[in-house]
Amino acid sequence: MSSIAAWGDGRRTRIGVLGGSFNPVHDGHLQLARRALRHLRLDQVWLMISPGYPLKPVQGMAPFDVRLASVAARFDGRRLVATDIERRLGTRYTVDTLGLLRLRFPHAAFVWLMGADGLADLARWRDWRRIVSLVPFAVLPRPTYNPGALRGEAAVALARWRRPARQAPILADCAPCAWAFLPAPQIGISATELRASALRQRSRHPTHKHTTHQE
């Protein structure tokens, strides 16, 4: 895991920010991060583990340090970087986190990354219009979510700022509220499904100890 200074620095790099609970981390996260690096021509993707995810229940959430270590073990720490910076910033909501990142890394070009499921839920996020006014963002497809996400409240409200996928390489250079829906194979795996699968295995074999990845 690479330590990113919470007080910031003067780096002039193109950085994708992929936040989430990572409970657990899975191949879909890795695929999304790699595709973002390639399609958006980023220098790094920060996998930002959330101390507490407001839209997800606390029950079943692995401890933060376990999730952080699990993510760090899956990514190279150079271009794909697991980070606890949100915990060190002391923020709870994305709008506050992105605001501080812009303030403390004033020369970095940030792109916020999400799956289509995130776009579908975006209008439920605190100050979501403020979020998209802070940095451009990129959306990657997720099975069953794509049509609803693109017809949802946030996507409709932001339709005039949507860039064609061919402009994805310059998205980091665009002013907010620019966004793009990236072309990519759809990522079907989800943390929810992995947790449910692990629970089913434990229920079938109650006396057998299972080791599962935690994010």
Swiss-Prot record:
GO terms for biological process: NAD biosynthetic process. Signal peptide: none annotated. GO terms for molecular function: ATP binding; nicotinate-nucleotide adenylyltransferase activity. The keyword Iron does not apply. It is an enzyme of class 2 (transferase). Its EC number is 2.7.7.18. Pathway: Cofactor biosynthesis; NAD(+) biosynthesis; deamido-NAD(+) from nicotinate D-ribonucleotide: step 1/1. InterPro entries: Cyt_trans-like (IPR004821), NadD/NMNAT (IPR005248), Rossmann-like_a/b/a_fold (IPR014729). It catalyses: nicotinate beta-D-ribonucleotide + ATP + H(+) = deamido-NAD(+) + diphosphate. Belongs to the NadD family. Catalyzes the reversible adenylation of nicotinate mononucleotide (NaMN) to nicotinic acid adenine dinucleotide (NaAD). This is Probable nicotinate-nucleotide adenylyltransferase. The gene is nadD.
